[in-house]
Amino acid sequence: MAQIKIYGLHDHLNRHRDAISDAIHASAMAALGLPEEKRFHRFCGLDSADFIFPSDRSRRYTIIEVSMFEGRTVETKKDFIRQVFAALADRCGIEPQDVEITIMETPRHNWGIRGVPADELTLTYKVDV
């Protein structure tokens, strides 16, 4: 399970929403082993007054926050990050200089999903990869 928030300027996200979502989810499937149907993305478009960033970033500056179950190896998470950078550049023209990715891991017992704590769910995919 991964819940992903994507922050950027309204106009940028509106133009590239589908491509960004596809790039991130393809990377999550390849690196993290998420199933195709487990796409949980929230786009948070901001006005320029509400999204302040350094001058060495362009108007394509995009912040990606990933909340997911703990259990994946350091190498798996690094692979995911690298794949997201590459996919956003290839599919969306968003250069790595304009992307920041943060991963926050949470024990499954701290998630509630479909009426139960997540550590009581039977998953259709592996987390310990």
Give the label of every model feature segment:
Residues 1-129:
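Interaction-mediating elements
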